[in-house]
Amino acid sequence: MVRSVWKGPFVEGSLLKKADVARASGRHDVIKIWSRRSTILPQFVGLTFGVYNGQKHVPVAINEEMVGHKFGEFSPTRTFHGHSGDKKSKKG
């Protein structure tokens, strides 16, 4: 379900503060965040965020195509190890 337009995008308050500090300092360090539910805003373009996936912080460099999406979309939480192969083809 899509969020109502009149509510506006959700962004964690601490995330906005961290982004403002990073922009003001001009440093290009990875900003560690745990808020996967926050929406990516245009003011985040050019910054790199470390989005927590439950084990580690995955670095995500924000570009213009990502605006409007959620941070969690770019930090997968599960690893796919593949399906088991056909046992008959392995034997022969």
Curated annotation (Swiss-Prot):
Which keywords does this Swiss-Prot/TrEMBL entry list?
A: Ribonucleoprotein, Ribosomal protein, RNA-binding, rRNA-binding
> Cellular component terms, GO, for this chain's entry?
cytoplasm; small ribosomal subunit
Where does the sequence pass through the membrane?
Answer: none
Q: What would you give as a GO molecular function for this chain, any one?
A: rRNA binding
Q: Which GO terms describe its biological process?
A: ribosomal small subunit assembly; translation
**Which InterPro entries is this protein grouped with?**
Ribosomal_uS19, Ribosomal_uS19_bac-type, Ribosomal_uS19_CS, Ribosomal_uS19_SF
Say what the protein does.
Answer: Protein S19 forms a complex with S13 that binds strongly to the 16S ribosomal RNA.
Family, similarity comment: Belongs to the universal ribosomal protein uS19 family.
State what protein this is by name.
Small ribosomal subunit protein uS19
Record organism = Rhodopseudomonas palustris (strain BisB5)
Which gene produces this protein?
Answer: rpsS
